[in-house]
Amino acid sequence: MGETRHFFLTGCASGIAKHLTGVLLGQGHSVFATDVNLEALENAAREGAWPVERVRLRALDVRDADAWENVFAEAVREFGHIDICMNIAGLLLAAWATDQPINEVHSQIDVNVKGVIFGTRVAARHMVLRGKGHIINIASIAGLTPVPGMAVYAATKYAVRAYSISACMELRKKGVYVTAICPASVQTPMLDGQLHNDAADLFYSGYRMLTVDEIEHAIFKRAMRRRPPYEVHVPRLKTKLAKFVDNFPAVGPIFAPLYQWSGRRRQAQRRAEEQRAK
């Protein structure tokens, strides 16, 4: 990625953001790493031997707009400026449309949508003043196609994608770019938490899960270009099918049973592996 840069990341205690934090620090960059769970974030830093001179660890509840203002301002004071902000923190709680508890509706919308909007808003204001910067928002394949069993989650990821592309249209002329990353299922603790949830079967479909290394490649090689794209789909073939179903939703019920069968089979295999490991 050339010269060293200053990054601001959310959700760094686990999953994609934890992996990216370690990679960025290994490349010599500085990272302002945040998570709602500071203790888990500190544990991740110790486990990864993150260099204290180039990383700052702070608690951040992405649902709190005032917290965003304060923590991002601290990051600017610490590093002088932020080159790239990655809104990665997310929440997946699968449930059938008739059964999703109200608190889960609120929590997914608050974390996945409001968290990204608050973060993009704060980072964009800082970057516009500098005349340059890049904001990367993690959406999902669920932002490209309807997903039975995850109606609320899919709605939040559609919102993240639409917001990111709309904001990019506004900001590009000011030197600031926004890119939405839309991956298929990624093997992370967030997805592991849905292993025993039958409503999440579609997210376990397909011949394999993406790895955090593949998301790293998509971000570093495809998103972080001199002129960043509006969105990046990972992998290309599966997301093309998702876009097709989005354009022609009536074909969804034709494909869905096959993918649900595949997902349930994979869930059963993973559950059996979990039992054997105990």
Spans of features found by a protein language model:
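SDR active-site lid
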Residues: 172-236
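Substrate-binding pocket helix/loop in short-chain dehydrogenase/reductase
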Residues: 96-97, 101-109
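Residue(s) in the substrate-gating loop at a strand-loop-helix junction
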Residues: 140
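Conserved glycine-rich Rossmann-like NAD(P)H-binding loop of the short-chain dehydrogenase/reductase
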Residues: 27-43
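Canonical Rossmann dinucleotide-binding motif of NAD(H)/NADP(H)-dependent dehydrogenases/reductases
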Residues: 2-32
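Active-site helix of classical SDR
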Residues: 120, 156
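The beta1-alpha1 cofactor-binding region of Rossmann-like NAD(H)/NADP(H)-dependent oxidoreductases
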Residues: 59-70, 102
